[in-house]
Amino acid sequence: MSRVKRGNVAKKRRAKVFKLAKGFKGAHNSLFRTAKQQVLKALRYSYVGRKRKKRDFRRLWITRINAAAHSQGMNYSTFITALKKDNIALNRKMLAQLASNDIKAFQAILETVKN
């Protein structure tokens, strides 16, 4: 059986890691072992971040809706309860966009919910 030299495979493997480590500081983008560790850590952080982003945006929307509802004399929980009771199917993202961009439409929704 003939000898197999792994030069090309090893170079490709390292190049793949260094490509992902581009922009990292210090030895983290130039030494293979540390670059590989940092890439794995960065991939873990990005995975967790994609999950966290959903929670963070939901919190932001709730905060915006609460602030807009408070300015009209109603709190968030009673507003959402009244929306559900009146079968108004607007999600929190839409409500937050209305609260920040189209205040008159948000006030109209509040008035229909109050009555």
UniProtKB/Swiss-Prot annotation:
Keywords: Chloroplast, Plastid, Ribonucleoprotein, Ribosomal protein, RNA-binding, rRNA-binding. InterPro entries: Ribosomal_bL20, RIBOSOMAL_L20_CS, Ribosomal_protein_bL20_C. It holds the Pfam family Ribosomal_L20. It comes from the Eukaryota. It is found in: Plastid, Chloroplast. CDD domains: Ribosomal_L20. Binds directly to 23S ribosomal RNA and is necessary for the in vitro assembly process of the 50S ribosomal subunit. It is not involved in the protein synthesizing functions of that subunit. This is Large ribosomal subunit protein bL20c. It comes from Porphyra purpurea. The lineage of its organism: Eukaryota, Rhodophyta, Bangiophyceae, Bangiales, Bangiaceae. The gene is rpl20.
